């Protein structure tokens, strides 16, 4: 097992449903934080991040950085949603990476399905 654990509450996502992700880092070295990159394949739409570790946010972007200083016990939880109406089924790629001095140390990928 690696230094990064990443889970989603569900890989079956629907419009405006809450997406909850949990991240755990056991990397023994120094690191700056984790970054979550999300791509809705075959679409130019973005995920909307709602919060991380109980801190409210609203960013219409495909990337969220969580600083190590805001990760008690090297853990993070984020919530997000996708708001556009899916006219087809989309594949959503979530990629979480440990970042140290602008370099990626390790990453995990989860694919989810977005549909009506």
Sequence positions of predicted segments:
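C-terminal beta-sandwich interaction modules and adjacent acidic
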Residues: 1-116
């Amino acid at each position: 097992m690696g230094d990064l654990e990443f889970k989603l509450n569900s890989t079956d996502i629907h419009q405006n449903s809450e997406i909850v992700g949990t991240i755990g880092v056991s990397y023994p070295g120094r690191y700056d934080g984790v970054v979550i990159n999300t791509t809705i394949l075959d679409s130019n739409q973005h995920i909307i991040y709602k919060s991380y570790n109980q801190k409210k946010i609203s960013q219409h972007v495909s990337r969220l950085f969580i600083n190590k200083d805001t990760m008690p016990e090297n853990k993070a939880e984020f919530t997000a949603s996708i708001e556009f109406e899916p006219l087809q089924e989309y594949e959503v790629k979530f990629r979480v990476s440990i970042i140290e001095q602008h370099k990626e140390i390790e990453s995990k990928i989860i694919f989810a399905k977005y549909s009506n």
